[in-house]
Design a protein with these regions (language model features):
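Substrate-binding pocket helix/loop in short-chain dehydrogenase/reductase
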Residues: 94-96, 103-108
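Conserved glycine-rich Rossmann-like NAD(P)H-binding loop of the short-chain dehydrogenase/reductase
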Residues: 24-40
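Residue(s) in the substrate-gating loop at a strand-loop-helix junction
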Residues: 139
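The beta1-alpha1 cofactor-binding region of Rossmann-like NAD(H)/NADP(H)-dependent oxidoreductases
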Residues: 57-69, 101
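Active-site helix of classical SDR
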Residues: 119, 155
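Conserved glycine-rich cofactor-binding loop
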Residues: 10-11
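C-terminal helical subdomain
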Residues: 179-180, 199-243
Length: 243
């Protein structure tokens, strides 16, 4: 039985991915900052599925938490076949001279450093086994800049570059590294970006049909099931109304 580790799985894409894979028969290690939210969706699943999910409260911004969490994973979940680096966020949307340093730091610490911390503790065992797969969740914001996106754009451009570098480093060890770069996905993303302002967040998706978290989970599952000689390097996925 294969095992997937998903970061940022309290809600949104991470939650949908965890549920998708456990229903497909995988073991799932679910990491997120909001333990009760993970516990709630886990408890809504059939008991047979619940037994194949191990949830941990982990903030990927903390290298020490990440290192400690790995040590606490039960033996039957320890061999990670697929790592999905999903944890990420945008905070604020303002010109560079009006941005908040605390927002910048949290985006850099989560979107970039968090991805590095998790990859650092998972990838060595993949190298030893000469097998494994890593899927990084990037963004269209890592392909194109937009006004007031500045630091968020920078973190996602960095994820794009890091994914390419990881693929170059790890391909010799038969490890596949992919990136999924979504456009607008209707999750808590915009509400978080606007510091809990729900009205402002709702305007982001006005007069359009955005992607859903399940759309990205389906794509992750598809990539995970390609033959071992196939590496889907990068996928840009957009709502039909976003061009």
């Amino acid at each position: 039985m294969k095992t997937i580790l998903v970061t940022g799985s309290s809600s949104g894409i991470g939650k949908s991915t965890a549920i998708k894979f456990v229903k497909a028969g995988w073991n799932v290690v679910s990491w997120g900052r909001r333990f009760k939210k993970m516990e709630a969706w886990k408890n809504n699943l059939p008991l047979t599925d619940q037994k194949r999910i191990f949830i941990q409260c982990v903030d990927v911004m903390s290298a020490s938490q990440v290192t400690e969490a790995i040590q606490l994973i039960p033996e039957n979940f320890k061999v990670i076949d697929l790592l999905v680096n999903n944890a990420g966020l945008a905070l604020g949307k303002s010109p560079i001279h009006e941005g908040l340093i605390k927002d910048w730091e949290q985006m850099i610490d989560t979107n970039l450093k968090g991805l590095l911390y998790v990859t650092k503790v998972i990838s060595p065992e993949m190298v030893n086994r000469k097998s494994g797969q890593i899927i990084n969740i990037g963004s269209i914001a890592g392909k194109e800049t937009y006004p007031d996106g500045n630091v968020y754009n920078a973190t996602k451009f960095a994820v794009d570059a890091l994914t390419r570098g990881m693929r170059q480093d790890l391909s010799q060890h038969q490890i596949r590294v992919s990136q999924i770069s979504p456009g607008m996905v209707e999750t808590e993303f915009s509400e978080v970006r606007f510091h809990g302002d729900k009205k402002k967040a709702q305007q982001v998706y006005k007069n359009m049909s955005p992607l859903k978290a399940n759309d990205i989970a389906d794509l992750i599952y598809y990539i995970s099931n390609t033959p071992s000689h196939v590496n889907v390097a990068d996928v840009l996925i957009l709502p039909t109304q976003q061009a």
